[in-house]
Amino acid sequence: MDKKKVLIVDDEPDIVTALKFNLELENFECIEAYDGEEALLKAKNENPDLILLDIMLPKINGYKVSRLLKFDESYKHIPIIMLTARAQEKDIKVGEETGADEYITKPFEMDKLMSVITKYLGD
């Protein structure tokens, strides 16, 4: 069986490294992007099964990345989980309006994140 592919988008290299390490332990293939522009390119070129997306990104923010992908017929099927320190109700509402499937605030428990990923990608 092919590994499920997860695109990790965050401008903090330590967060990307930690997520990648944990996801690879669970047998996921990981793709990395460090800004919104790179995220869009990799989403379109790599065809990930799921995207972990920070909001506060250089070049194009996570809200816009989510909106651009979710309102494009070719990519709207890809689940997007927003991972962000922005925990106010208005931020969550904007995340939902952009089409994000889940909104998880930092800091988060890896077990919780893995259960959400499994919800979308199966075991």
Q: What is each stretch, according to the model?
A:
Residues E46-L52, L57:
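Active-site beta3 strand of CheY-like receiver
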Residues F108-I117:
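C-terminal output helix
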Residues V16, P58, K76, Q88:
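The feature encodes the CheY-like receiver
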Residues N27-Y34, K42:
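Short hydrophobic/Thr-rich beta-strand motif most characteristic of the beta2 strand and flanking loop
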Residues T17-L25:
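Charged docking surfaces used in two-component/phosphorelay signaling
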